[in-house]
Amino acid sequence: MKVNLRKLMQLIVFFAHHEAVKPLGKTKLFKLLYFTDVTHLRTVGHPITGAEYLKYPYGPVPMQGNFALKELQKHRLIRQERVQITKTRFRRQITALQMPDMTIFTAQEMRTIHSVIQQYGEDTASVLSWKSHQESAWLFAEDWMPLQLAPEKHSTEQDEKNAEAIALLDQWYATPDDKPPGYWDDLLKEIETNRLQFRDEGLEL
């Protein structure tokens, strides 16, 4: 399926404009795009944007994603800026400068988009990265992720423990200076036990 750049770009503007997904960084955006295409594929039989996804350590990345972001910024539809979240941590934040054109999407596509926002919109980038790692398309892919593998999900008994560790990590990022002695060391031990790997959102792709 050929990528529909117009839909891809307007979907990016839509996510950047929607209050339910703010703040929006590049890692979170790329995972929302992936889950939108995968959800529509499972429901209807084909993705919305037709984008090809590459397998990166922190989840799927649309091959045309960076190009779309550059074009949107060039035409002043979005703004990308480096935002300081703590004394030492920064995040690349994406903000919409104009309203998206949603008339190009079908009613079924809009239902899919809103369902993705409802299900994933409040998740952080690290949580979405972990969730994308449970997808068969990510587990069995080498360099690029064929969405044909997407209808199946992979889950293990470790999933709940992983989710708890991610939630704790997100709590620490939210209030890094207000933790009791030993909290961070204990959290790192738990993450290591669960064999998870994280990265600061300030070092996004």
Language model features: what each stretch is:
Residues 1-156:
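Domain-edge interaction signal
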Residues 7, 24, 64, 105, ...:
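Generic detector of ordered secondary-structure context
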Residues 18, 119-123, 174-175, 193, ...:
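A structural signal for alpha-helix termini and helix-coil/disorder junctions
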Residues 36-43, 177, 192-196:
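Short alpha-helix boundary/capping elements
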Residues 44-45, 162, 199:
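Glycine-centered secondary-structure boundary/capping sites
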Residues 155-194:
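Short interaction-prone segments
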Residues 197-204:
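Short, charged, intrinsically disordered terminal tails
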